[in-house]
Each structure stands twice: as structure tokens, then as C-alpha cells.
A protein has these predicted regions:
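Short, polar/acidic, helix-capping and beta-turn segments at strand->helix junctions
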Residues: 2-163
Length: 163
């Protein structure tokens, strides 16, 4: 067992008041994750809760279609919860098999003048550290894009090492 994180991730989740959502189904012709050796590559996750997209639009845009920084950070956290929900079956239901979070890739649908993509993706990064401790610290990209699938404001993909 990797001593860099809790011996019991389920207990850590419970202590944090987190209930993992059901893993969202794929929206197109791809699989939710692929395992190669000890690495698990998880497809990009949108801020979906109970099959519904919770955050739509461009971050930093004004008007009714605009998404605030705070809303986007919350959406990134939901994406991270969905990543972990996809990871759990790759670990045969045992998240204690996670050795480390290797990398997150975050995409933020951004207004042309919005440049705080790293702050948005911190919503996902912070959650990984909260859950996995030091093993949750990871390499990362935070990229601004014009649009994302289904009009989502945020998408996060992940790479994890398991034993």
C-alpha cells in the first residue's frame, strides 16, 4: 500500500462528506477508460450529475449565458468526481489500489478575455489532493477553448497509476 495517501480512500471520502456519483455513460463512440499496464487513462468527463449537464456556457462571458469563475470551479470539481467514479471500476471497486494521480488535462470553454483557466481546474486538482493526499498531486494542463461537447463549460480528463 502506498503510504502517501489514506489506507482507506472510502473512509476519506466519507470523512469529506463525498458520495461518488454513478459514472456517466459515454456520449459518443469511445470507452470511459482504457488500462495499459498500471496506467488508467480516463476519457474527458463533463460536469454531469444524474445524467444532466450542470454547467453550460463560456466562462467569463457576460449575460445570461455567462459562467462565473466560482461556477466553473464547482463544475471542475464535479468533473473530478466523475473521473473517480470512472476510475473505481478500473480498480475493481477498490480505490486503495490508486498509487497516484499522474496527470489531469482540463479544458475550459472561455470568453476571449478570460485567462484564469488554471484557477478553474484547481477545482479538480484540489479535490484529488483532498482525497488521495500527496498521491493526488499531479502534472496538469489547463487550456482555454471556444466550445466543449454539449455546450459544457468545463471538461477534465485524467491519468492514474494503480497497482
Amino acid at each position: 500500500m502506498n503510504q502517501k495517501h489514506s489506507k482507506d480512500i472510502d473512509a476519506r471520502l466519507q470523512a469529506l462528506g463525498i458520495t461518488l456519483p454513478n459514472a456517466p455513460t459515454s456520449a459518443a463512440n469511445y470507452v470511459p477508460f482504457v488500462q495499459s499496464g498500471n496506467l488508467v487513462f480516463i476519457s474527458g468527463q463533463l460536469p454531469m450529475v444524474d445524467g444532466k449537464l450542470t454547467c453550460v456556457g463560456q466562462v467569463g462571458a457576460g449575460g445570461d449565458d455567462g459562467v462565473s469563475l466560482e461556477q466553473a470551479i464547482d463544475a471542475a470539481r464535479v468533473c473530478a468526481l466523475n473521473l473517480i467514479s470512472q476510475l473505481k471500476p478500473a480498480c475493481d471497486g477498490d480505490l486503495d489500489r490508486v498509487v497516484r494521480v499522474v496527470r489531469l488535462g482540463g479544458f475550459v470553454a472561455s470568453d476571449n478575455n478570460f485567462t484564469d483557466q488554471p484557477k478553474v481546474i484547481n477545482g479538480a486538482s484540489d479535490l484529488m489532493v483532498d482525497i488521495f493526499g500527496d498521491a493526488g498531486r499531479h502534472a496538469r494542463a489547463a487550456v482555454g477553448v471556444n466550445t466543449l461537447p454539449l455546450g459544457a463549460a468545463v471538461e477534465v480528463e485524467g491519468l492514474f497509476e494503480i497497482n
